[in-house]
Amino acid sequence: MNNYKLQAPYEPNGDQPEAIKKLVKGVNTGKEFQTLLGATGTGKTFTIANVIQQTGRPALVLAHNKTLAAQLCNELREFFPKNAVEYFISYYDYYQPEAYVPVSDTYIAKTASINEEIDMLRHSATRSLFERKDVIVVASISCIYGLGIPSEYLKAAVKFEVGKSINLRSYLRSLVENQYTRNDIEITRGRFRIKGDVLEIGPAYEDRLIRIELFGDEVEAIRYVDPTTGEILESLEQVSVYPAKHFVTPKERLESAISAIRSELKTQLDKFTYEGKLLEAQRLEQRTKYDLEMLKEVGYCNGVENYARHLSGREEGSPPECLIDYFPKDWLLVVDESHVTCPQLHAMYNGDQSRKKVLIDHGFRLPSAADNRPLKCEEFWEKSKQTLFISATPGQWELDQCDGEFIEQVIRPTGVLDPVIDVRPSEGQIEDLLSEIRIRAEKNQRVLVTTLTKRMAEDLTDFLSENKVRVRYLHSEIHSIERIEIIQDLRMGEYDVLVGVNLLREGLDLPEVSLVAILDADKEGFLRAERSLIQTIGRAARHVEGVALLYADNFTDSMKRAISETERRRTIQKKYNQVNGITPKPAGKKIENSILSFLELSRKLDAGGLSKDLINIVNNKTDAILGSSDNQCLLEELPDLIEKLEIKMKDAAKELNFEEAANLRDRIKKLRQKLARNN
């Protein structure tokens, strides 16, 4: 039974109906690989949404970075509001892997900061895969890393059912074994508390509490409860509480793992002793024996992931179980921007192994640590049964898997043509660019400028700023979420120009951009290859007046091919518009904060409030309007006001002032409705 309910204010048109028909037919007939070659702005995501809806398969949509994954997730959530569209990326805000530098005899311990909200979204994804068929998981490459054992994770779930008698002490022990902790004062995700005949649990996979009401040993009621106000949100007949961590090891398996680790330790110590590596042997023995004691006493140790092979009972060299193994057998893989994502997949394993080998050779880890790894590319494709590659510029590897065949989608639903390409000499390019920027700024349009080096981007940004241009610089040191904010500020008109090096390409949805300027377009190389040029030019393909300026003194082969392909598409698009009487019109895509509000990455403190820098911004902007009528607030002030009121609501609840908290909650609800109506 197909449970997907696709909701969209428009029907497929242009090339979309034919592309959908061919892709669906390929999936239903068991085709292993298919490629959708879709030009920028032709609605590839909508096409894929239709394919998922018509095939009814659980789907994994793979993106090559967090920013694009967030954008895709938001778009798919809009198309499937009644289905489970989940988000799965690395949960590290900061990650420094364990490493050793032999030249300087420097050991670097692993340090990491885990983002609780992303961890919750990851748990939500695996829970949905166990409980529903209508699931779309949008993930980054981190999904190919080990994620426990799905069968053990499912088996460890603690089940409650209304009318059933339970042994409360036994159930509490099960929660503790599943890495929940008891805290009778404050309950958050991963904690539980018991007061009289009421057990409350903060599940790892959502921000609602589960309340189990008992009458003696019998479960009398199961409810979802608002953690702030205590309001009952929903009553249930039964519920499964999944473990607080994905890595679940039963007691009997832990004992056999400890035995296997001891055996491997002895073998490696004998090897080091035979080779005369006494320092390495002493180091390994000391570290491993300490870890074994920790595992024996508390079931956990620092760096426990390095013993994953033994803890999961895998054979040496066997692939780890990852997110893919949580999917049912008939799932569908969609690889977005495949020309970038596939090479990433193929490179992850080798980079991981080179670091691990140094640690093993110098006695910091046992050889089995090498099996705590991402999937090899061949292991990944073996687990993937049916794949759709999506790209405006598919790589040769993807085309080879499809025997050179692809499904083309060139016509935009808006009728907008590919950008006009204008090649100009590099002499005087900066002054020329400045005049073009001023023309666009007067029309309230946006400009992207891409340079070859970081230094050039910095210097250009300084020059434009000195000439009273509202400009920002996007570079690799900016965190993913700040990057989303910068891109959104560009769309909202906070500034007119965005300068970058290699960050202004795949997947950025910027309908307000009418001009893309490529400096030094004739410098042949990765950043000015045919595929890179087509992708960069495509950033102006959503605007009716889209233009790509290429500053160059020579025509390279890459430039010729990119220009030729763009002209080919323009010819097809122009002919289609003439035949069908279509006049190009703006995309009119909403500017929204949904990505930022959806992620909420590192914006909250451990106590649950907003980050200090954001609080300062919110305080400055909203102190004046907190006391005024909500109807007097400007639309752009509403998000900040809502966040400020949420802080006050949580503070009121902590002080047990539930009446004020409830009033604030109702006020927030009305403000959200007002915001939704105007978006």
Curated annotation (Swiss-Prot):
Could you tell me the keywords of this UniProt record? ATP-binding, Cytoplasm, DNA damage, DNA excision, DNA repair, Excision nuclease, Helicase, Hydrolase, Nucleotide-binding, SOS response
Binding sites annotated in the UniProt record for ATP: 38-45
* Residue ranges constituting the Helicase C-terminal domain according to the UniProt record: 429-583
Signal peptide (UniProt feature, chain positions): none
Question: PROSITE patterns in the record, alphabetically?
Answer: HELICASE_ATP_BIND_1 (PS51192), HELICASE_CTER (PS51194), UVR (PS50151)
Primary site of residence:
cytoplasm
Give the UniProt record's GO annotations in the biological process aspect.
Answer: nucleotide-excision repair; SOS response
Location(s), subcellular:
Cytoplasm
Where is the motif Beta-hairpin annotated in this sequence?
91-114
Please list the residue ranges annotated as the Helicase ATP-binding domain.
25-176
Gene Ontology CC: cytoplasm; excinuclease repair complex
What Pfam families does this protein map onto?
A: Helicase_C, ResIII, UVR, UvrB, UvrB_inter
Every copy of the UVR domain together lies at 639-674
Q: Which NCBIfam families match?
A: PRK05298.1, uvrb
The family classification in the record reads: Belongs to the UvrB family.
Comment block on domains: The beta-hairpin motif is involved in DNA binding.
Return the HAMAP family for the record: UvrB (MF_00204)
Record function comment:
The UvrABC repair system catalyzes the recognition and processing of DNA lesions. A damage recognition complex composed of 2 UvrA and 2 UvrB subunits scans DNA for abnormalities. Upon binding of the UvrA(2)B(2) complex to a putative damaged site, the DNA wraps around one UvrB monomer. DNA wrap is dependent on ATP binding by UvrB and probably causes local melting of the DNA helix, facilitating insertion of UvrB beta-hairpin between the DNA strands. Then UvrB probes one DNA strand for the presence of a lesion.
| Oligomeric form and interacting partners | Forms a heterotetramer with UvrA during the search for lesions. Interacts with UvrC in an incision complex.
Protein name as it appears in the record: UvrABC system protein B
